[in-house]
Design a protein with these regions (language model features):
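An N-terminal assembly and electron-transfer interface module characteristic of large anaerobic redox
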Residues: 1-191
């Protein structure tokens, strides 16, 4: 997203270099939100809207986990030109770039030299369950949501979405619970 226009792209393969100009990004400091291409996009979009409401440009970048994420971060300045990265918000869990690309991504983040924040999509608990819990995050998720990202300098974890209400799928009859953005938490992270 940039200047109120939808600015998203799925990153995969080699054809996405110099995407910033294609998306109409300006030569200005830009906050980047990195998420998975196969995840819900409402949370990343809501975060970009909140950042833009504060007068900063924002772009949501969606890539596959592993090699595509490593490539995106290694080439981020060229990818987003003419925009200049000002901060990065990572919504991916585990380590960006997977085990094979962890060190390369860590080096790319060091070269970027921008603050890197961790946004958490809580898929096990609703907003109410999360707020009433004694532990915040389920203990078995702290490793991949907080500890592993911290190995790469991705810190200040912040929950920005939680499990939404059950909705019946018309085709299968299954009750599906998708993540739902938490507006107050998104505003906190954006500030």
């Amino acid at each position: 997203r940039s200047q109120g226009r939808e600015q998203r792209a799925e990153l995969s393969g080699e054809g996405w270099l110099r995407l910033g100009a294609t998306l109409g990004l300006r030569a200005a400091p830009t906050v980047l939100v990195l998420d998975l291409a196969n995840a819900e996009t409402d949370s990343a979009d809501a975060l970009c809207r909140a950042i833009e409401a504060r007068g900063l440009a924002c772009a949501a970048l969606f890539s596959r986990w592993g090699g595509a994420s490593r490539q995106a971060l290694e080439q981020l300045p060229a990818l987003l030109a003419p925009a200049q990265p000002a901060a990065l918000v990572v919504m991916q869990d585990f380590v960006v770039g997977a085990a094979d690309g962890r060190e390369a991504v860590s080096a790319a983040l060091t070269r970027l030299n921008v603050p890197v924040f961790k946004a958490i999509r809580l898929t096990e608990r609703s907003q109410t369950q999360w707020r009433l819990s004694s532990d915040g995050l389920p203990a078995d998720s702290v490793q991949y949501r907080v500890a592993l990202p911290e190995l790469q300098g991705i810190g200040q974890p912040h929950v920005i979405s939680a499990l939404g209400p059950a909705q019946r799928d018309a085709a299968t009859g299954l009750a599906l619970r998708r993540p739902q953005a938490l507006p107050a938490e998104i505003q906190r992270l954006a500030s």
